[in-house]
Swiss-Prot record:
Residue positions binding Ca(2+) 3: D101, D103, D105, K107, E112
Record keywords, A-Z: Calcium, Metal-binding, Repeat
Residues annotated to bind Ca(2+) 2: D61, D63, N65, E67, E72
Residues holding Ca(2+) 1: D26, D28, N30, K32, E37
SUPFAM superfamilies: EF-hand
Residue positions binding Ca(2+) 4: D137, D139, D141, E148
Residue ranges constituting the EF-hand domain according to the UniProt record: 13-48, 48-83, 88-123, 124-159
One function term, GO molecular function aspect: calcium ion binding
Organism field: Dictyostelium discoideum (Social amoeba)
Superkingdom of the organism of origin: Eukaryota
Protein name as it appears in the record: Calcium-binding protein 2
Functional description taken from the UniProt entry: Not known; probably binds four calcium ions.
Pfam families cross-referenced by the UniProt entry: EF-hand_5, EF-hand_7
């Protein structure tokens, strides 16, 4: 599969994610989301600092009318070239490694992931850890590397809105 096809697939996935985002936040179903709609929805969901997330989304309000349309949000995707998308993918991989690699060896062990979920009070950290390793430890050597994460992202539908990394 060529890199161009891969990035087109990512763009399509991003557009679907945007459509889902609009369905979730457009409380009055007028095809536009307001800053207040985003903040209120995030607050109801128990998110901390909903204004910060709304600020990030509203960078795409190109006409600065206080309403974000799906077309405005899609412009960001169009403006992203393949190089930028690859940079974002690599940043996500780096962030996942940095968030979970406790000993700095650039590999994530099962114990490191298990410790992370246990510290966060996950309901079943063993089950979550096993699931992550079944999917991402491609060579079954007990560690997850940057290359395995990149390969996992290539094979799976990549989503910018659904992080594969544990939440902080």
């Amino acid at each position: 599969m060529s890199a161009t096809v891969h990035y087109k697939d990512i763009r399509k996935g991003m557009e679907k994610d945007l459509e889902s985002l609009f369905k979730k936040y457009d409380s009055d179903r007028n095809g536009k989301i307001t800053y207040i709609e985003i903040v209120e929805t995030l607050r109801k969901a128990g998110k901390k600092n909903p204004e910060r997330i709304a600020d990030l989304l509203f960078r795409d309000d190109t006409d600065k009318n206080g309403e974000l349309t799906i077309e405005e949000a899609k412009l960001r995707i169009v403006r992203m070239n393949d190089e930028k998308i690859e940079k974002v993918l690599n940043w996500d991989v780096e962030k996942f490694i940095n968030d979970n690699d406790k000993d700095g060896d650039r590999k994530i062990t099962r114990d490191e992931v298990l410790q992370r979920f246990t510290e966060q009070g996950a309901e079943d950290p063993e089950l979550i850890t096993d699931s992550i390793f079944r999917q991402m430890d491609l060579d079954r050597d007990g560690v997850i590397t940057c290359d395995e994460i990149k390969e996992f992202n290539r094979k799976k539908k990549f989503s910018f809105l659904k992080s594969s990394a544990p939440k902080q």
